Amino acid sequence: MPARETERMMKLQDVILKAMAKKLKRGPHRRRRPRRPMPGMLLHIDGSKHRWFQDDRYYDLLVILDDATSRIYYAQLVAEESTRTVMTALREVIEREGLFCALYSDRTSHFFVTPKAGEPVDKSRLTQVGRALKELGVQMIPAYSPQARGRSERSFGTWQSRLPQELRLAGIATVEQANRFLRERYIAEFNHKFTVKAAERGTAFRRCGRSDLGWIFSIQTERVVAKDNTVAIRDQWWQLDKTRWRHTLAGQTVTIHQHLDDTVSIRYGPHVVGRGKDGAVENQNQVSPRSLEIASGDSHFSTASTTNPLSPKPKAKRVA
């Protein structure tokens, strides 16, 4: 064999060996996880930040889809994926479709507590979303890589290539218009085109007979009532009036419920002892004073007066 031909063969073998070594280093090819056989067994929730309009504005598209069929149950544009927007989405799906078995998500802070980056989640410490789903008996499953969320990731690739053009053709340039378009038209068209048939007949969704979803899907924090019968909510202290049934709640633990409609409720055990409005539930800015009204219909604690029974008191410190 001529020297030139021998040299060419050696180079070719070297290339082949390097390619084989690289393939072995990568390890086995990741196989796609089989779909769950029935709708309602596993739902995916994920958000995708993208320029959905014909300008430089970025919004998160929050989507909930079924693992068995890829059917979209929820898709809305939000300023940012957060505890409140996730709770809003989950509540809507549960009210319309029913309770599902498990939710698959990434490990962002509104889903899971991760003590250290790269480590497993701490399932003993629940986020607000985790607490709500535990109350409803829904399992939460964390994804540890983008590849593990392949089904939702592939779906977002389709959304990002199609939705901006659809919005442009429809002359839509605001979030409100876009969300209405998604609800009234686009989700149905998307499902008609991309939904697949489930492996098994039937559904794992079960009717939700709970009438307290508004309480479950609220941001809950506990506070100890101060000696002067006040409660700290953000940067304001609220005065609780004396009641005929109990002179004071000082020293007792109450639960502050910050609802998705920006209202606030104060509960002592099963009893609602105050309600009001708070437009800065997740805003770190100072909350302006707002009156809270005792909800007599929800509590056996009758109030001595019905005029502004809970009023803000300016103080410099919080309840411990």
What are the functions of these language-model segments?
Residues D122, Q128-E200, A204-W215, T255, ...:
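Charged alpha-helix within mobile-element recombinases
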Residues V15, D46, I64, S70, ...:
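Mobile genetic element proteins and their domesticated derivatives, centered on retroelements
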Residues D55-D56, R107, D235, P270:
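Residue-level detection of beta-strand-connecting loop/turn positions
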Residues M1-R26:
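Double-stranded DNA-binding cores of transcription factors and transposases
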Residues L90, I94-D122, A143-P146:
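Acidic/histidine-rich, metal-coordinating catalytic segments
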Residues G27-I72, A79-A89, E95-F100, R131-E135, ...:
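Mobile-element integrase/transposase regions
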